Amino acid sequence: MSLPVLQGTGFQFRRILSFFPQDISLAFTYGSGVFRQAGSSHNDVRNKMLDFVFAVDDPVTWHTMNIIQNRSHYSFLKFLGPKHITAVQNNYGAGVYYNTLVPCDGRLIKYGVVSTETLLQDLLHWRTLYIAGRLHKPVKILTQRDDGRLKSALTSNLKSALNAAFLMLPESFSEEELYLQIAGLSYAGDFRMIIGEDKDKVLNIVKPNVPHFQKLYAAILLDCPLAVYKAQQGRVEVDKSPEGQYQQLMALPKKLQQNITALVDPPGKNRDVEEILLQVAQDPDCSSVIQQALYGIVRSSSLSQSAKGIVTAGVKKSVQYSSKKLYKMLRSLRRGKS
């Protein structure tokens, strides 16, 4: 999954990683500080905050070591100790603990810590679609443990993204339309897209980075029995028959299937999941059902994770971070009017 990124940035990412405890199963960096987005110049990219995620097997031990090495990164929660920090990480929001606006090696960074098990559950089942959603889009993998379960879960997450996108697209579409749909999956229902994000965020992510998306999805598309991938023309065709859509629905992550079931099945009926998904496969409004089910996952996790961020970052940093996001939103609105 490692992808080429902006020229000359790989060494700095590895240097930054060296400032942290090294017992990490997966570390990656992502976002506009790594992959150039539409409307950004080279200087803009150099000045952007860098975003990282670290997956660790034992968060208590990792936070213990990180507080020793990087005590200033933490809010007042450091005084409660690593067990309380881990409890906040695991029991609230999307299971991720973020330290933000951290000066490191001449750059400002934000990094999230997630347990390896929480990451696996999100990749496989889309419990929150928080980290799984980030991994639908190009990222720069900095370290990845040789672990068959993790490798399989990362691939499963990409296949799930394709199936969900297929169900919301027409029978024939361009590669760019596919990647726009995939990139938007984890923003469906995210309240930050209403308040605090660039209104053209999904378009800006995809437009300059189609080759990076191709590196993630081309091999899976070629191997997909329900799709015809015409790489030379940049087109994709999918099976939109009820049988084809049923297979795609059955391959969706468990949490998304549960949300679909809750939307479609009247209370008290208690039908089998297979029966409900067969009904959805024949529904002309199948795509809107998928969209609503995604909203339910993302809305809940984005709200609770953002609320947790006020505690983990502290009030001062939360205000600074929110101000930056609001500035981006207002700038995109001004661009839209011009």
From Swiss-Prot:
Keywords on record: Lipid biosynthesis, Lipid metabolism, Magnesium, Membrane, Mitochondrion, Mitochondrion inner membrane, Nucleotidyltransferase, Phospholipid biosynthesis, Phospholipid metabolism, Transferase
Cellular component terms per the entry's GO annotation: mitochondrial inner membrane; mitochondrion
EC top class named in words: transferase
Annotated metabolic or biological route of this protein: Phospholipid metabolism; CDP-diacylglycerol biosynthesis; CDP-diacylglycerol from sn-glycerol 3-phosphate: step 3/3
Enzyme Commission designation: 2.7.7.41
Any matching Pfam family: Tam41_Mmp37
Reactions accelerated catalytically: a 1,2-diacyl-sn-glycero-3-phosphate + CTP + H(+) = a CDP-1,2-diacyl-sn-glycerol + diphosphate
Key word Magnesium present: yes
Localization: Mitochondrion inner membrane
Membrane topology value: Peripheral membrane protein
Superkingdom, taxonomy of origin: Eukaryota
Chief place where the protein resides: mitochondrion
One BP term from GO: CDP-diacylglycerol biosynthetic process
Cofactor(s) this protein cannot do without: Mg(2+)
One GO MF term: phosphatidate cytidylyltransferase activity
Purpose of the protein: Catalyzes the conversion of phosphatidic acid (PA) to CDP-diacylglycerol (CDP-DAG), an essential intermediate in the synthesis of phosphatidylglycerol, cardiolipin and phosphatidylinositol.
PANTHER family linked to this entry: PHOSPHATIDATE CYTIDYLYLTRANSFERASE, MITOCHONDRIAL
Family as reported in the entry's similarity comment: Belongs to the TAM41 family.
Protein name, entry field: Phosphatidate cytidylyltransferase, mitochondrial
Native organism: Xenopus laevis (African clawed frog)
Annotated gene: tamm41
